[in-house]
């Protein structure tokens, strides 16, 4: 899981959440806006960040800038799905992701669907349990996708051939 240089990528932006938040001081309430943004190239790189500012547009541009700096590359199988099932837990959020056959589409809800679209995953099944807050679901998705390993990576770590890790069903 390495940060990616975003300057030479063709990026797409998506706002996941906008919320008006307040800070209570001696003089009263101070309102500002919190924006959560996703940035991705739809080819395996995605970044997520949140930012606060007094104006929505300023908060959005700040969140997008931070998300570009936090971009991560994930391994995809055939450029459309993941290599294997994965379960992840972060706080009260639980997430199960599973590869799907070609043509299935993105079977996921809300923030997880946006995350998969920005990442470039076109066939996946994802189920989120527990907390459905968009920010925690996306952070949990980043954790889950970072647990997915390609057969090449596993073969290299174990000094084995890649064919030892691929089932016959996948190769056909």
Swiss-Prot record:
GO terms for molecular function: rRNA binding; structural constituent of ribosome. GO terms for biological process: translation. Part of the 30S ribosomal subunit. Contacts proteins S4 and S8. The lineage of its organism: Bacteria, Pseudomonadati, Pseudomonadota, Alphaproteobacteria, Rickettsiales. One of its GO terms (cellular component) is small ribosomal subunit. Residues 11-74 form the S5 DRBM domain. It holds the Pfam family Ribosomal_S5_C. It comes from Neorickettsia sennetsu (strain ATCC VR-367 / Miyayama) (Ehrlichia sennetsu). InterPro entries: Ribosomal_Su5_D2-typ_SF (IPR020568), Ribosomal_uS5 (IPR000851), Ribosomal_uS5_bac-type (IPR005712), Ribosomal_uS5_C (IPR005324), Ribosomal_uS5_N (IPR013810), Ribosomal_uS5_N_CS (IPR018192), Ribsml_uS5_D2-typ_fold_subgr (IPR014721). Keywords: Ribonucleoprotein, Ribosomal protein, RNA-binding, rRNA-binding. NCBIfam families: rpsE_bact. Belongs to the universal ribosomal protein uS5 family. HAMAP family: Ribosomal_uS5_B. This is Small ribosomal subunit protein uS5. The N-terminal domain interacts with the head of the 30S subunit; the C-terminal domain interacts with the body and contacts protein S4. The interaction surface between S4 and S5 is involved in control of translational fidelity. With S4 and S12 plays an important role in translational accuracy.
């Amino acid at each position: 899981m390495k940060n990616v240089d975003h300057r030479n990528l063709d990026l797409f932006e998506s706002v996941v959440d906008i919320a008006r938040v307040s800070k209570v001081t001696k003089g009263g309430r101070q309102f500002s806006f919190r924006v959560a943004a996703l940035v991705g190239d739809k080819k395996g790189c995605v970044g997520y960040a949140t930012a606060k500012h007094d104006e929505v547009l300023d908060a959005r541009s700040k969140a997008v800038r931070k998300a570009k700096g936090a971009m991560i590359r994930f391994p995809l199988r055939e450029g459309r799905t993941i290599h294997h099932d994965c379960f992840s837990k972060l706080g009260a959020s639980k997430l199960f992701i599973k590869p799907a056959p070609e043509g299935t589409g993105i079977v996921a809800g809300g923030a997880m669907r946006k995350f998969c679209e920005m990442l470039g995953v076109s066939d996946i099944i994802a189920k989120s349990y527990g907390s459905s807050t968009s920010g925690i679901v996306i952070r949990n998705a980043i954790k889950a996708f970072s647990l997915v390993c390609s057969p090449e990576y596993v073969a290299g770590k174990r000094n084995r051939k890649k064919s030892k890790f691929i089932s016959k069903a996948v190769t056909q």
